[in-house]
Amino acid sequence: PEALLSRANLAVDTLDRYSQRLDEVLQTLTILEMRDSATVRDVATVMQRMEMIRRITSEITEYLEELGSEGRLLALQVEDLIRGSASERALVMRDYIRDPADVARVEAELTSLGSERIVDLTAIANILGLDVYEVADLDREIMPRGVRALSLVPHLSWNAIKAVSAHFTTLPQLRAASVADIEVIDSVGHYRAQLIVENLAHQAQAVGAGVVGW
């Protein structure tokens, strides 16, 4: 058990480092999205980090199952480190995968990607359907749908998020929309439209993006 506990502790340390790195690249992506300058590379890097976290978490789960009650403290640590990561992963995917019906396929392909290919951002970008044919394509700018940004708006249902992101299709279009533009969408209305406009402006201000990006 001591050797197993030692391996589990090392894996949790790795998870901690991965989580910190994910926070950094996710924050960078958020800033770039609000400045309308996110690239395929930025998105692929975030997905790469998320997949690495999923893999190390899966490994730790196996250790914890073997450790039983002796792994309880580690289990709490892991829970704390990965809190919200699954929903964040789903939101990033829905922002950049063209067809939401492809999410399950993308998940499966990322999971089956060999450990030697998880470092290949081109492979990850192509799994996401972002059409990378050469390394230079990784630096192509790409627009999110705004799903993740909308998820931060209080009192907004998932149905409303889907309806709004389907209506405007990109975050820049959504940020340029007025309350009148948004309130006509099904399941939104005036109050929620106002919340969306105010919250998106606040998000942009929080990352220093201003209302019109750069």
Name what the model sees in each region:
Residues R54:
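Phosphate-binding and adjacent anionic-ligand microenvironments
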Residues D16-R17, R21-T30, M47-M50, S58-I185, ...:
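Long, highly charged, low-complexity intrinsically disordered interaction regions
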Residues E2-A3, T39, D120, S178:
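General structural signal for secondary-structure boundaries
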Residues P1-S19:
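Short, exposed interaction patches on small structured surface elements
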Residues R41-M47:
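Charged heptad-repeat coiled-coil "stalk" segments of single-pass membrane proteins
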